[in-house]
Regions:
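Short, polar/proline-rich extracytoplasmic segments that appear immediately after membrane translocation
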Residues: 2-57, 61-62, 142-145
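Surface-exposed binding patches on compact interaction domains or structured appendages
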Residues: 38-54, 79-116
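Short, well-ordered turn and helix-capping elements at secondary-structure junctions
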Residues: 58-63, 106-108, 125-127
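Solvent-exposed, conformationally flexible loop/turn segments
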Residues: 60-67, 112-116
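Residue-level marker for the onset of beta-strands and adjacent loop->beta junctions
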Residues: 68-70, 107
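C-terminal, structured domain-capping segment
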Residues: 72, 115-145
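Asparagine-centered strand-capping/turn motif at beta-strand->loop junctions
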Residues: 74-78
């Protein structure tokens, strides 16, 4: 009977350690986000024909360590050539910026009146993220010139 107990303890310890190891190996934390897009002096669209306005971006579920990309099209809707700048605001929770970064591939080129460029927006989630299960923030695209 004593041998059976020792065997059960060893089996229980083995199973428990496998659960811990599996938990360490599998990042099953998914983050959900929706970001609002505000445009100043420009239009931001889902298509190059500028018929589908972007008002928000649903990043969907993202695992730790993931990079999510979306392509948008930005049109100069002002009356002079412009360059673009980007800001993010209203991060919720406020510490999300410790683990989540946002960037784009715009290279600073001048955009003439009514011209359209494609831009990739990227969301990067740190593999060390903790304590955040949902987040949101606003993206502000500014055309100036």
């Amino acid at each position: 009977m004593h041998g059976l107990r020792v065997g059960w303890v060893v089996l229980t310890a083995f199973v428990a350690s496998m659960v811990v190891v599996y938990g360490l190996m599998s990042a099953s934390v998914y983050l959900q986000s929706v970001g609002t897009v505000k445009a100043l002096g420009v239009g931001v669209y889902w298509d190059s024909g500028c018929s589908q306005t972007v008002s928000s971006i649903d990043w969907g579920l993202a695992e730790p360590g993931a990079v999510k990309n979306v392509t948008v099209y930005i049109r100069n809707e002002g009356n002079a050539p412009i360059t673009l700048s980007l800001q993010t605001t209203n991060w919720n929770p406020s510490n999300a910026t410790d683990y989540i970064s946002f960037s784009w591939n715009y290279s600073g080129q001048t955009i003439d009146l009514n011209h359209v460029i494609g831009v990739t927006l990227s969301l990067s989630i740190s593999s060390n993220i903790e304590g955040i299960t949902t987040f949101s923030f606003d993206v502000v695209v500014i055309g100036s010139g």
